[in-house]
């Protein structure tokens, strides 16, 4: 039974064909069925008003086993590495990146906390996962972790759980309806167009610190020009006085970095952008 369009809550249209292909691999998997409580939210963002934090989410999938927050990676080739760094090797080309699971797990914890506030203890458990949509082999130290999804079993793991055993809190139709009603209230919304800051397009979240978030970013005009963008957070209920105070603190840090200039171990300051 095909997974119907009515169960997919779509976000922004993706400009990346590999992202669209990865999502379709999930929806077309033979393990998925057009039955409750199955629901999917693709390309959404999660806004936490109390902190001002914003998290990009590739895919959320609801099944009887809970809510799965899935980070999608579509690099081709053979995956090697450990719990810290991953390397994809394909026809002589190598690409190394930080293991994306900790970032996905952080988002899952934020979502779980927001769900707890909206639904109390009667909420689905939130699992973090990483889906490698284009990998040919996995050779990680210690073997394949249970949260790592591959094209051959992505559907079965989302439907049946990572280990195939029933979760302690099974999601029924009533819980599904509560979640659908609460989705907008808890800050889950379709992603806007690509976020731009000072001519740079924000990418992966790499640091989630006290009062700020940092993203990798690419120059929209010169793709090889890459940077890290630090965004200082302003909670939704912040007064004008407190907002001005936070703005001054951000400017002070920018001035300090500008005065340091080039220094080993410290990224060089480029610009301060008001948002």
Residue spans of the language-model regions?
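Intrinsically disordered, low-complexity Ser/Thr/Pro/Gly-rich regulatory segments
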Residues: 1-205
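Short, flexible loop/turn elements at secondary-structure junctions
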Residues: 44-48, 74, 221, 233, ...
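Short, flexible loop/turn motifs enriched in small residues
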Residues: 54-55, 210-211, 275
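ATP-binding glycine-rich phosphate-binding loop
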Residues: 192-224
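ATP-binding glycine-rich loop module of kinase domains
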Residues: 211-258
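Conserved N-lobe motifs of Hanks-type protein kinase catalytic domains
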Residues: 260-264
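Short beta-strand micro-motifs within the conserved protein kinase catalytic domain, predominantly
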Residues: 268-275
């Amino acid at each position: 039974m095909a997974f119907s369009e009515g169960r997919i809550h779509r976000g922004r249209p993706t400009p990346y064909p590999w992202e669209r292909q990865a999502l379709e691999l999930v929806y077309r998997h033979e393990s998925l069925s057009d039955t409750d409580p199955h629901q999917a939210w693709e390309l959404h963002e999660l806004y936490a008003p109390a902190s001002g934090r914003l998290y990009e989410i590739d895919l959320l999938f609801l099944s009887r086993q809970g809510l799965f927050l899935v980070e999608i990676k579509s690099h081709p080739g053979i995956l090697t590495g450990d719990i810290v760094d991953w390397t994809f090797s394909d026809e002589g080309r190598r690409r190394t990146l930080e293991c994306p699971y900790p970032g996905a797990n952080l988002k899952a914890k934020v979502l779980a906390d927001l769900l707890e506030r909206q639904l109390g203890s009667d909420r689905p458990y939130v699992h973090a996962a990483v889906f490698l949509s284009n990998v040919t082999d996995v050779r990680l130290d210690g073997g394949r972790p249970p949260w790592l999804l591959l094209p051959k079993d992505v559907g079965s793991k989302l439907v049946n759980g990572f280990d195939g055993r029933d979760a302690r809190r099974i999601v029924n139709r009533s819980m599904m309806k509560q979640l659908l009603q609460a989705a907008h209230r808890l800050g889950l919304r379709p992603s806007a167009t690509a976020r731009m800051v000072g001519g740079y397009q924000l990418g992966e979240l790499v640091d989630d610190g006290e009062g700020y978030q940092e993203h990798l970013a690419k120059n929209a005009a010169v793709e090889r020009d890459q940077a890290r963008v630090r965004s200082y957070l302003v909670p939704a209920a912040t007064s004008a006085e407190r907002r001005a105070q936070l703005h001054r603190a951000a400017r002070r840090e920018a001035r300090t970095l500008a005065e340091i200039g080039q220094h080993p171990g410290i990224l060089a300051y480029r610009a301060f952008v008001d948002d």
